[in-house]
Amino acid sequence: MRILSSPFRWFVLAVMALCLTIACAPQPTSNSPSSAARPLVSASNNWVGYSGHPVAVGKGFFQEAGLKVDDLFFQSAGEQITAFLANKIDLGWFTSGDAIQMMAKDPSIKIIYLIDYSNGSDGIIGRDIQKPQDAKGKTIARENILFEKVVLQAYLQKGGLTEKDVTIKDLAAADAAAAFAAKQVDMAVTYEPYLTKSAKQGGGEVIFSTKDTNLVADVVVARDQLIQSRAADLKTYFKAVDKAVKLLNTSDAEALKIAGTKLGVSGDEMKAQLQGATLFDIEGNKTIGFNPDSPKSLLGNLKVTAKAAYDFKIVPQPLKVETLYDDSIVKAL
């Protein structure tokens, strides 16, 4: 038989020893912390209900938990949607309508957490509009995204109207509000921190809002691969967000200041605007958000929003609600 030369034999033994060392070393799993992993890229926009995100960043809750998070902030939902679909974002804070709109292009996207229900901070401002029927023939500014279409549809239907009865001007929420304030449009679909202020500036009023409804839900979305590969990090992430939301729900002055600074308003203004959003913590996600037995469950909102997506021809066929979300992270918290 062939016998290895002494130097080569020692080389082979060294390689084998190295392989055994690597094989025996503890390997990271999706259920163990991954502090050495790349940062989670988390993005939100200028909706008041997303204030838990800047507070978690500003208070250092992610850092305290040993989680690296890159914080991105967008001035419009449309820009944020584009970035998420381009795989530039891991975790996105969106309306459920935005989420479903993206799922039509990427079915691997799933809703994994309920952030809030709009409770009056989304709405429509109008000038000389006394009833829904008065909207006929008017020029209305709204962004070409599903949740704003749903809000406008809910109002127009009360007057037996559709978008075919009005002129639509496609503008992001901030720009729509500015156009109304400048009296360039008759009505605008927008949200706080623009809704109330722009109504006054434009000589109008809030003629319709989401108060006492779950018409607009805000959620966190991620792709299947991230949910499976970084489950431990996602649990850490939402525990940090939970701490921030609890501060906001108790009107903590420092938290309100951090959130207000992000949106360009004072802490007192932030406190007032947050009255128009019902923020959910982990417990709320468990008992209401993903609880099919709750009358205010997110699942009811998804059913309505999925139907609207089909009606507006955003998706080619009706979507099954159970395919839109993954509640495994919430259940594990």
Go through the PLM ranges and name each one.
Residues 302-333:
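Conserved C-terminal helix/tail region of periplasmic/extracytoplasmic solute-binding proteins
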Residues 70, 78, 272-280, 320-332:
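Short linear loop/turn motifs
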Residues 1-39, 333:
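Short, low-complexity disordered leader/linker segments with a strong preference
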Residues 46, 73-77, 117, 145-149, ...:
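Solvent-exposed, acidic/flexible segments
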Residues 90, 97-98, 168-169, 175-264:
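Pocket-lining segment of extracytoplasmic ligand-binding domains
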